[in-house]
UniProtKB/Swiss-Prot annotation:
<dbReference type="InterPro" id="IPR011814">
    <property type="entry name" value="BioC"/>
</dbReference>
<dbReference type="GO" id="GO:0032259">
    <property type="term" value="P:methylation"/>
</dbReference>
<dbReference type="InterPro" id="IPR013216">
    <property type="entry name" value="Methyltransf_11"/>
</dbReference>
<keyword id="KW-0808">Transferase</keyword>
<dbReference type="GO" id="GO:0010340">
    <property type="term" value="F:carboxyl-O-methyltransferase activity"/>
</dbReference>
<dbReference type="Pfam" id="PF08241">
    <property type="entry name" value="Methyltransf_11"/>
</dbReference>
<comment type="pathway">
    <text>Cofactor biosynthesis; biotin biosynthesis.</text>
</comment>
<dbReference type="InterPro" id="IPR050602">
    <property type="entry name" value="Malonyl-ACP_OMT"/>
</dbReference>
<keyword id="KW-0093">Biotin biosynthesis</keyword>
<keyword id="KW-0949">S-adenosyl-L-methionine</keyword>
<dbReference type="InterPro" id="IPR029063">
    <property type="entry name" value="SAM-dependent_MTases_sf"/>
</dbReference>
<comment type="function">
    <text>Converts the free carboxyl group of a malonyl-thioester to its methyl ester by transfer of a methyl group from S-adenosyl-L-methionine (SAM). It allows to synthesize pimeloyl-ACP via the fatty acid synthetic pathway.</text>
</comment>
<protein>
    <recommendedName>
        <fullName>Malonyl-[acyl-carrier protein] O-methyltransferase</fullName>
        <ecNumber>2.1.1.197</ecNumber>
    </recommendedName>
</protein>
<dbReference type="GO" id="GO:0102130">
    <property type="term" value="F:malonyl-CoA methyltransferase activity"/>
</dbReference>
<dbReference type="GO" id="GO:0008757">
    <property type="term" value="F:S-adenosylmethionine-dependent methyltransferase activity"/>
</dbReference>
<keyword id="KW-0489">Methyltransferase</keyword>
<comment type="similarity">
    <text>Belongs to the methyltransferase superfamily.</text>
</comment>
Length: 284
């Protein structure tokens, strides 16, 4: 089974209840959506990348009533949930595809909204390169992803039990900015915040992650079963991190990103450069 199939299967399994249980992802997306409303843009075509059950596709359609929305997700089951949210007067295409190889024409979108999806890619550079391709000149990319401190409690607790990786690897915000520039995006703005979610019990915490589609795809993960001894060590170590009220904390390092697609200009030597659209001056 490929990594994409693993991810799709994990999300599809919980598609019916995803919007109800994925409160963290919805809150993060709402904060990104709030930032979007401050931008003075009028996109004609919008891609909701990793649209899931379609909550933000619907919000985007309300914010930009004249725009054509396209929802894309790896999971067919998620897209079926998104389809149910569409009114009979206004429907939008729903596409199942890999974000590293999207079935869209070059320059198709003026805005890409990507909430909690790009960290599921095996190559951030390939995702940004493909996004740059499908975006129109002066198009805007708005996204959220996760940083290295995400699930740090899980990392610490499992490190006391065995040498395997139990948490996915997340890219540092500074490296994300560098990657955007390397893939010809202009004026990237990256910032982060830490969110701490508290659970009454450890099983409750782990179940919440499972029902949110969270899956360990780290190449260094244990491909076999975890023994009872390692599990008990994990539980004991996590218990030492409980709050003063006895709850189990779980940290999310949330990274917010915004960038623009600049204009491409060919030099006499055949070398291509990318410049902000604001610097493009038409000759009279």
């Amino acid at each position: 089974m490929t990594v994409n199939n693993e991810i799709s299967k994990a999300f599809s399994k919980h598609a019916d209840d995803y919007e109800r249980v994925a409160k963290v992802q919805k809150e993060i997306g709402s904060r990104l959506f709030e930032r979007l409303q401050y931008l003075k843009i009028a996109p004609r075509r919008i891609l909701d990348l990793g649209c899931g059950p379609g909550f933000f596709s619907k919000e985007l359609a309300l914010l930009y009533p004249k725009a054509q929305i396209v929802g894309m997700d790896l999971s067919f089951a998620m897209l079926e949930q998104a389809r149910k949210k569409q009114g009979w007067r206004r429907k939008w295409p729903l596409v199942s595809a890999d974000m590293q190889k999207m079935p869209f024409a070059t320059g198709a979108f003026d805005l890409v909204f990507a909430n909690q999806v790009i960290h599921w890619s095996s190559s951030l550079g390939m995702v940004f390169r493909e996004l740059n391709r499908v975006m129109n000149v002066n198009g805007c990319l708005m996204f959220t992803t996760l940083g290295p401190d995400t699930f740090k409690e899980l990392q610490t607790a499992w490190s006391a039990a065995n040498q395997y990786a139990h948490v996915n690897e997340f890219v540092d915000m500074h490296d994300i900015g560098d990657c955007l520039i390397a893939e010809h995006f202009m004026d990237p703005v990256i910032d982060m915040e830490l969110l701490s979610i508290h659970y009454e019990t450890l099983p409750q915490l782990l179940l919440a992650l499972k029902t949110q589609g969270v899956r360990n795809i780290n190449p260094k993960r244990n491909h076999g079963l975890t023994g009872k001894s390692a599990w008990k060590q994990f539980e004991a170590q996590y218990a030492t991190m409980r709050t003063t009220t006895g709850k189990y904390p779980l940290t999310y390092e949330v990274v917010y990103g915004q960038a623009w697609k600049g204009a491409q200009r060919k030099m006499e030597q055949g070398i291509e450069t990318w410049i902000p659209v604001s610097r493009v001056v038409k000759k009279s």
